[in-house]
Amino acid sequence: MKLSCLLLTLAIIFVLTIVHAPNVEAKALADPESDAVGFADAVGEADPIDWKKVDWKKVSKKTCKVMLKACKFLG
């Protein structure tokens, strides 16, 4: 039970990291008979987080609610 909640916590952190990461766009161009040419553009469109203005009490309450629901669902 505790291990599944720990794994769920890590999964939530991983998903939040992806959601708050800047957009990355990758494209590949190729002709039918030639080698592929690829390029990648990283566009930082995410707003920077002002850690001083984060309401940690609200964040922890919401995280706990999600964790409790998930643990009840899994257990």
Swiss-Prot record:
Organism (species):
Myrmecia pilosula (Jack jumper ant)
> GO molecular function terms here?
toxin activity
Q: Which Pfam families match?
A: Pilosulin (PF17499)
Q: What residue stretch is flagged as signal peptide?
A: 1-26
- What name has this protein been given in UniProt? M-myrmeciitoxin-Mp2a
- Keyword Metal-binding attached: no
Per the record, residues carrying Leucine amide are: L74
Please name the taxonomic classification of the source.
Answer: Eukaryota, Metazoa, Ecdysozoa, Arthropoda, Hexapoda
Q: What is its main location?
A: secreted
**Propeptide feature: residues:** 27-48
How the protein assembles, per its UniProt entry? Heterodimer with M-MIITX-Mp2b (pilosin-3b) (AC P0C023); disulfide-linked. Only heterodimers (and not monomers) have been identified in the venom.
